Design a protein with these regions (language model features):
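Acidic (Asp/Glu)-rich catalytic clusters
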Residues: 15-16, 52-58, 84-89, 141-147, ...
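Conserved anion-binding
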Residues: 98-198
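Conserved N-terminal beta1-alpha1 strand-loop-helix module at the mouth
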Residues: 1-64, 70-82, 86-95, 172, ...
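Short, well-ordered coil/turn segments that N-cap beta-strands
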Residues: 17-21, 57-60, 90-92, 122-124, ...
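Conserved, mostly hydrophobic/aromatic
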Residues: 23, 62, 97, 126, ...
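C-terminal helical cap(s) of enzyme catalytic domains, especially alpha/beta-barrels
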Residues: 234-244, 253-281
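A C-terminal functional module that forms or caps the active site or interfaces directly
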Residues: 199, 203-248, 252-253
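Active-site-adjacent beta->alpha loops and helix N-cap segments on the catalytic face
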Residues: 71-86, 103-109, 132-145, 204-212, ...
Length: 281
């Protein structure tokens, strides 16, 4: 399989050219209703097409949440396929937010579903869960290297329940979250200008100075907007790693739909706020 240019290099270029903003595509039923759309495959398709039209190619990343498509069965997955393909054709990098995690051949099959160049759902990167052991991700790591794609590994997530696992302390004195960050630093060692194996770290977590976030890879940071974090918080939370942060905004942008211009304006406002905060750090 002939791979793309590595995901980390493509992402760094997109961040430099368009700013680091990631816009989530989260068509949950209440948001479809706010847009005046039916909670149906038709509503799902209209919603997704509108978001892609509004912001693809204007922000660094689009991140569809696969569960909101999967709930409609095969017809919803068909809409997801179309959404991914149209977003990439319009110039966006697509991170599939599927949070897959398993072992052996099953993990390999999950990786092939999203990271193999011939897959209908082929995306630029995939979110994965390492909590069957980081080594369980090795099939996905190998395929990502081969295909020029990337992974975002759940490390320090923004949901309160995550701390039960991620802040647990191992026998060697390190937390589970810190261990995951250490694995990513090894994956990305020596990569320029940016490694392809990133961490998911919540922007709402406050002071993370006890963690080494410099993994030489991207940090996908949910929590900006509706969850309470702001662009101005990013330097304090992420410190010297802030230049590698890809802040995710979903509802803060999507609530401005269904008007394409309003969606685009909201995304551009967030992008400018983030760019200003990162530049000033």
């Amino acid at each position: 399989m002939t791979g793309l240019e590595p995901f980390g290099a493509r992402l760094r270029r997109a961040m430099d050219e368009r700013g680091p903003l990631c816009v989530g595509i989260d068509p949950h039923s209440s948001l479809l209703a706010e847009w005046g759309l039916d909670d149906s495959v038709s509503g799902l398709e209209t919603f997704s097409r509108t978001v892609v039209e509004a912001v693809a190619g204007r922000v660094a990343v689009l991140k569809p949440q696969s569960a909101f498509f999967e709930r409609f069965g095969s017809r919803g997955v068909a809409v997801l396929e179309k959404t991914v393909q149209e977003a990439r054709a319009a110039g966006a990098l697509v991170v599939m937010d599927a949070k897959r995690g398993d072992i052996g051949s099953t993990m390999a099959a999950y990786a092939e579903s999203f990271l193999h160049r011939d897959a209908p759902l082929f995306s630029d990167a995939l979110t994965v869960s390492p909590y069957l052991g980081y080594g369980s991700l090795s099939p996905a790591v190998a395929l990502a290297r081969e295909s020029g794609t990337g992974l975002f590994v759940l490390a320090l997530t923004s949901n309160p329940e995550g701390g039960e696992v991620q802040h647990a302390v191992r026998a060697d004195g390190r937390t589970i979250g810190a261990t995951m960050l250490g694995h990513l630093a090894l994956e990305n060692a020596g990569e320029e200008p940016l490694g392809s194996f990133g961490a998911v770290v919540g922007a709402t977590l406050g002071d993370l100075s006890s963690y080494d976030l410099d993994v030489n890879g991207p940090i996908l940071a949910p929590g900006i907007g509706a969850q309470g974090a702001t662009a101005a918080d990013l330097p304090a939370v992420f410190g010297s790693a802030v230049r590698n942060v890809v802040p995710n905004v979903s509802r803060g942008v999507l609530r401005h739909g269904p008007d394409v211009v309003a969606l685009r304006d909201a995304a551009e406002r967030f992008a400018e706020e983030i760019r200003t905060a990162v530049t000033a750090a």
